[in-house]
Regions:
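Conserved, single-site charged/polar hotspot
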Residues: 1-441
Length: 441
């Protein structure tokens, strides 16, 4: 994206493919051709489009798309929004939003709920949803800049021809997940893009102050806005872009040590076995409970073992998980063999061997997805098969490091750096090699 634009208005998919929605309009909203509406509402779909009903259950609009334009100061509440979709923290909650509400019929049975809002107002919610508005000031500034950068780069990527998100092969299933595959809105409101939970999570003025202080600032490289990725905790070393996404190295998304001292990469199985059971002196290796309470939203604090973790399954449990996630019957599961790791120890290619067949899968998110009812915290793990007298595995034990894909900014590491006194510019330089901070509007 060129380094000179105006602040855009964006569309955020709050929920998609919903049979119906209920909520409340707090203040007046204008529906073109209909008039003002406020108070409780519900909506569903039929062959003619969206059916919008008011508090008295009167039909007030029936069209393929219904746009409710907010009067100044008005907000709207959506009930039972699912967050953390397919992750271990998945749940439903009511959320309140600023800006306009758009209801679009997907088909005769489902609708999409979309929020139209200015980018800067969107960011205040993202910062407060991804982390906590009580986090250190320099960290909130860092997150404002990278979230702004990611969003602008994502808008630009929508207009590009992308490589297929799957590498074909009969014995290999190598798949990754792009974040610009939404067709009727710019970004979604969940972890697939950036967490956006409206004004519900804005618990202090600090996030708004950080967004305002950094207004229009982005990370740039080579004259373009950076695709600034981020995640919760690297485990000690961040990852190269191509371990998680397409085989196109990005100069500012390269592996770095999450410390002032260089650490050797975790490329071999011997090094991985040592790494996942170690406790290196790195920024995201923190036991500062006060800081974690300041920076993590409530549901993220439920995850206590994010730096190093352990998961165990019986063989039959893991066989069923893999069968459910992949749709493939491997028979009796014999082995899981890492074939290729990135510098952080995250597995890029993993062979699954069963009595019926053997398949190589990747990349990191697909591996995490296949080996858990939700997702493993990361693909930086070792796996040991505990075998019975007949030589067949009875249990599989996973020892792992970190939380997330590992590419770009380590959120917990960056927050620790801010607590130690590092400035936003220093934190960004640490995680994004060679990138610069630029003001574009």
């Amino acid at each position: 994206m060129p380094i000179d634009i105006r602040e855009p208005v964006i569309t955020v998919g709050i929920a998609d493919m919903q049979a119906g929605v209920t909520g409340r309009l707090n203040g007046n909203f204008l529906i073109e051709g209909t008039g003002l509406l406020s108070g409780p509402f519900r909506a569903s779909a039929d062959s003619g489009g969206v059916l919008l009903f008011d508090e008295g259950d009167h039909l007030v609009a029936h069209a393929p798309l219904v746009r409710l334009a907010a009067h100044e100061g008005s907000t709207f509440r959506i009930s039972d929004v699912t967050i953390g979709i397919r992750f271990h923290w998945e749940r439903k909650e009511d959320q309140v939003f600023e800006g306009n509400l758009i209801l679009t019929a997907r088909d005769a049975s489902n609708i999409a709920i979309i929020n139209e809002i200015s980018l800067e107002n969107y960011l205040v919610s993202v910062i407060s949803s991804e982390m906590s508005g009580t986090a250190p000031r320099e960290f909130l500034k860092v997150h404002s800049i990278i979230s702004r950068s990611w969003l602008l780069a994502a808008l630009d990527r929508k207009n590009m021809v992308r490589k297929p998100a799957q590498k074909p092969g009969t014995e290999e299933l190598i798949r990754w997940y792009n974040r610009e595959d939404h067709d009727i809105f710019d970004v979604c409101a969940d972890d697939h893009c950036q967490r956006y939970q409206g004004i519900t999570k804005i618990i202090s003025d600090m996030a708004a102050a950080a967004v305002n202080e950094t207004r229009g600032y982005v990370l740039a490289y080579g004259g373009n806005v950076c695709d600034a990725r981020y995640f919760k905790a690297c485990g000690g070393i961040t990852e190269n872009y191509e371990t998680a996404w397409e085989e196109t190295p990005i100069p500012y998304l390269v592996s770095i040590s999450d410390s002032q001292n260089a650490l050797s990469p975790v490329l071999s199985e011997d090094r991985a076995a040592e790494w996942v059971k170690g406790s290196p002196d790195v920024y995201c290796n923190t036991q500062d409970e006060e800081l974690l309470a300041e920076i993590l939203p409530g549901f993220d604090r439920e995850t206590t073992h994010f730096f190093r973790w352990k998961v165990e399954y019986t063989r039959s449990q893991l066989e069923e998980i893999i069968r459910q996630k992949s749709g493939i019957d491997f028979g009796t599961l014999n082995d899981l063999t890492p074939l290729e790791r990135g510098p952080s120890g995250r597995i890029k290619r993993l062979r699954i061997t069963g009595s019926k067949q053997s398949i190589v899968i990747g990349k990191e998110l697909e591996i995490r997805r296949w080996l858990s009812p939700t997702h493993l915290y990361s693909s930086a793990f070792t796996v040991s098969a505990v075998r019975g007298p007949d030589g067949r595995p009875e249990r599989f034990v996973f020892n792992g490091a970190g939380w997330g894909h590992g590419v770009g900014l380590c959120q917990i590491g960056a927050a620790v750096m801010a607590k130690k006194g590092f400035k936003a510019s220093e934190i960004l330089s640490h995680y994004f090699t060679g990138a610069e901070i630029k003001k574009i509007y």
